[in-house]
Amino acid sequence: MLNFELITTDGNARRGRVTLNHGVVETPIFMPVGTYGSVKAMSPLELNEIGAEIILGNTFHLWLRPGLDVVNTHEGLHRFIGWDKPILTDSGGFQVFSLGDLRKITEDGVTFASPVNGDKLFLSPEISMQIQRTLNSDIVMQFDECTPYEIEGRPATHEEAAKSMRMSLRWAKRSRDEFERLANPNALFGIVQGGMFEDLRDESLAGLSELDFHGFAIGGLSVGEPKEDMMRVLEHVAPRLPADKPHYLMGVGTPEDLVAGVAAGVDMFDCVMPTRNARNGWLFTRYGDVKIRNAAHRNDPRPLDESCACYTCRNFSRAYLHHLHRVGEILGARLNTIHNLHYYLQLMREVRESIEQHRFSDFRRQFASDRARGTR
C-alpha cells in the first residue's frame, strides 16, 4: 500500500506525504542506510530520537546473511531488526553488477559467485521480488541493471547504455508481474535508467510509466560520472516523472546534492555518506565540514555546530570528539554518526518548512552561503 499526497509545490520543489503500511513519511526525506539490517553505529532507539522516518535495507546482503529463513522466522525484517517504521529495500541489482568479472548477465538474470563463500548463485527479477516479499519491506525496488558510467575505462556509449536500459525495462515488467503474483501488499518502484543520455532516460521513463508503478526512482547516478553530468541528467529527468507519484534519487549524496535534488523535484534520498564519513571523522555542519581528526580541534571546547540540537552537540566538545577519533574509541563513531544523521534529517526538515512557506529559493541561497562560509 502506498498513498502519496502532494501538499504543495514551490517551483519544482515538492512538499509531500507518503503513507505506507508501517507509517507516514514526510517528504522531501533523507533515508539512512542500514545495509545489513543495521544503520552502522546507531540503535533503532537513536534513529527514532533523531527523527528518522524510513530506513533502507539491502536485499542482496540480507539474502546472503543472515538468510531468508532467519528473517522469515521473525515474520519479516521489521521484527528482526526492531524497527516498526517503514523500510525500503533495494533489489540487489546494484550489488550484483558491482561484482564485475565475478558475474554473468543473461536475459534470465545474473549468475555470480557469492562474495561470502564463493557459492554459485542466481538472481533474477522474480527471485528479487520473492526475497523482498519475505523481507516485507514497505517499498520494494524493481530488479534492474545499473548502467555503469565507465566500461573498460571509458564512458559507456549510447549503444551500450541503450542495451542496458532496455534490459532493465524488460526486467521491470517481470518484476511487476511477480510482485502482483505474490499479492505483495506493499509498494513497488520502477527505476529510470539510460546512463548519461537524455533520450534514453526519456525512453526508460515512458516504458516504466506504462507499468503503473507506485513510485519512480532515478538510478545510475553517482556512479563515477562528473558532477555536471549528474546534475544535467537529474534536472532533465526529475521534472518529467509523474507528478502524482513519489520521486526517489538513489545513492545521492552530499548536502548540496540533496538541496539541488529537491530543487529539481526529488522527494526521497539515500546515501551512505553521512554514516561512512562519520566513522572517518568527517562531519557535516551548517557552516561547512569539519575534519575532526585535524590537530586544530585538539583543545577546542566548542561543540561541532552551535546551531545543532543533536545529542552530540548538546553534550560534547570538538576536543573530546577529536580525542575519541585519535584513540579509536567506538563512542567516537557513534557520536559522529548521531550528529551527521541528525544534520541530514534537520536539513530536510528545514527544506520541507521552506517549501510550505514558498521560500525555498531564499532557503537555497542562504544554505549555500552558510555552507560556503566555513567553520570558524
UniProtKB/Swiss-Prot annotation:
For this chain's record, the cofactor binding note is:
Binds 1 zinc ion per subunit.
In its UniProt record, which GO terms are filed under biological process?
queuosine biosynthetic process; tRNA wobble guanine modification; tRNA-guanine transglycosylation
Q: Which GO terms describe its molecular function?
A: metal ion binding; tRNA-guanosine(34) queuine transglycosylase activity
Q: Which residues bind Zn(2+)?
A: 308, 310, 313, 339
Residues bound to substrate are 90-94, 144, 193, 220
Q: What Gene3D superfamilies does this protein map onto?
A: Queuine tRNA-ribosyltransferase-like
Region RNA binding: start-end pairs: 251-257, 275-279
- Enumerate the catalysed reactions: 7-aminomethyl-7-carbaguanine + guanosine(34) in tRNA = 7-aminomethyl-7-carbaguanosine(34) in tRNA + guanine
Output the InterPro entries linked to this UniProt entry.
ArchSynthase1/Queuine_TRR, TGT, TGT-like_sf, tRNA_ribo_trans-like
UniProt-listed Enzyme Commission number(s): 2.4.2.29
Q: Which Pfam families match?
A: TGT
Pathway membership, UniProt: tRNA modification; tRNA-queuosine biosynthesis
State the UniProt keywords alphabetically. Answer: Glycosyltransferase, Metal-binding, Queuosine biosynthesis, Transferase, tRNA processing, Zinc
User: EC class of this enzyme?
Assistant: transferase
Coiled coil start-end:
none
Instruction: List the active site.
Output: 90 (proton acceptor), 270 (nucleophile)
Q: Name one GO cellular component term.
A: cytosol
Q: Which cofactors are reported in the record for this sequence?
A: Zn(2+)
**Which PANTHER family does this chain map to?**
QUEUINE TRNA-RIBOSYLTRANSFERASE
Question: Hey, which family's this protein in?
Answer: Belongs to the queuine tRNA-ribosyltransferase family.
Q: Quaternary arrangement and interactors, per the entry?
A: Homodimer. Within each dimer, one monomer is responsible for RNA recognition and catalysis, while the other monomer binds to the replacement base PreQ1.
Q: What does this protein do?
A: Catalyzes the base-exchange of a guanine (G) residue with the queuine precursor 7-aminomethyl-7-deazaguanine (PreQ1) at position 34 (anticodon wobble position) in tRNAs with GU(N) anticodons (tRNA-Asp, -Asn, -His and -Tyr). Catalysis occurs through a double-displacement mechanism. The nucleophile active site attacks the C1' of nucleotide 34 to detach the guanine base from the RNA, forming a covalent enzyme-RNA intermediate. The proton acceptor active site deprotonates the incoming PreQ1, allowing a nucleophilic attack on the C1' of the ribose to form the product.
- State what protein this is by name: Queuine tRNA-ribosyltransferase
Organism, as annotated: Cupriavidus pinatubonensis (strain JMP 134 / LMG 1197)
